[in-house]
Amino acid sequence: MKTDTSTFLAQQIVRLRRRDQIRRLMQRDKTPLAILFMAAVVGTLTGLVGVAFEKTVSWVQNMRIGALVQVADHAFLLWPLAFILSALLAMVGYFLVRKFAPEAGGSGIPEIEGALEELRPVRWWRVLPVKFIGGMGTLGAGMVLGREGPTVQIGGNLGRMVLDVFRMRSAEARHTLLATGAAAGLSAAFNAPLAGILFIIEEMRPQFRYNLISIKAVFTGVIMSSIVFRIFNGEAPIIEVGKLSDAPVNTLWLYLILGIIFGCVGPVFNSLVLRTQDMFQRFHGGEIKKWVLMGGAIGGLCGILGLIEPAAAGGGFNLIPIAAAGNFSVGLLLFIFITRVVTTLLCFSSGAPGGIFAPMLALGTLLGTAFGMAAAVLFPQYHPEAGTFAIAGMGALMAASVRAPLTGIVLVLEMTDNYQLILPMIITCLGATLLAQFLGGKPLYSTILARTLAKQDAEQAAKNQNAPAGENT
């Protein structure tokens, strides 16, 4: 009897000790566990909103194209209607941005970078609806923009929204959930979870506070976002180019040449983006009426362009597989490349809510395919496949422009499911990055953020100067 009692007491003591250990562990790790839970919520919400954004944009595009099909036999109706529909959709996006949330204009990625440094505000209650509806208008109009910028900014703002809902006040939680939402947003846009993680670590490395809690939160958010995306869209790669052949070792030097070409193109492209932004700023001078009319004209132009040459309009996801398959001649590839450079500059630099990743991927594909086809003529003994150069070119322009080679490499490989091309991708992207840096090119998003902060400081200084003397004391 005594033995049974002693055994029972010993078991109770062990249970109490275990409970005490668990309680102390929970108390010690309460904040990290709460952050990880909220990261899962942020990732899930970002995945849901990202999928909804994609589906809504596709629906608007299909409705617009369906209306044009109805009058396809009447040219006197078709051309004006193509202009008017795209112009009206674009004007909705420009008006909402200018009137209610100027920070929702453009890509939105520089805004997230600024918010991570506590230099830009995060007003999720106005950015979320404006970015969603405005992006739906501009992308639905057929403008040369991508959905990755909106989903990254939407994801970051959802992170801040969750933080406010759960009433977390710590700077660590604020920073971590913002970064988690941004990573989940990129993953939701491209079905590329690893690229989403690398994007935060590489592109936002000056702003991202790397520690065990933050990186675990980013992982958690990206996992949830990717699961949601695949539930609705399946597990197939987002860009279907088929399985391409490996790049023989004796052709790798050609990829270095391609990287050098993109190393020259990247800084020039960035410079053109900034110059075009300045041109538009001088034109509208901040007046909402001029800004909206300008946006409508650009949107209408894209609508007309979509009738003349569909490959020259839109984000570019539909163009990439066609171009990579070698269905265009070298001359036509270069013509579409130049045309899309112009339309990308007009659409993105005007401040329309939309990203530039997808247009850059399309530009890289066009130039890479043209290079591959030329290489096949000049070096027939190598039997080069144009599609492999298209894949390498997709990541190279991003590497040279955004200065994120790792993200560019992994993003393209995840999107196309051609992991066997990792070596030529590394060679091309490294060559492009090194030459762009040597030529003095600056990362695009960092430069845009610096200009935004300079404008913010100038506006604040002007406000302080115009304020009554009593308000400044």
Swiss-Prot record:
The record marks 148 as: Mediates proton transfer from the outer aqueous phase to the interior of the protein. The keyword RNA-binding does not apply. Residues 109-116, 177-189, 193-201, 387-401, 402-404, 405-416, 417-421 dip into the membrane without crossing it. The record marks 203 as: Mediates proton transfer from the protein to the inner aqueous phase. Residues 1-32, 117-123, 167-176, 202-214, 282-287, 439-473 are cytoplasmic. GO terms for cellular component: plasma membrane. A motif (Selectivity filter part_3) lies at residues 355-359. The keyword Membrane applies. It is a multi-pass membrane protein. A motif (Selectivity filter part_1) lies at residues 106-110. GO terms for molecular function: antiporter activity; voltage-gated chloride channel activity. Pfam families: Voltage_CLC (PF00654). Belongs to the chloride channel (TC 2.A.49) family. ClcA subfamily. Homodimer. This is H(+)/Cl(-) exchange transporter ClcA. It comes from Salmonella paratyphi A (strain AKU_12601).
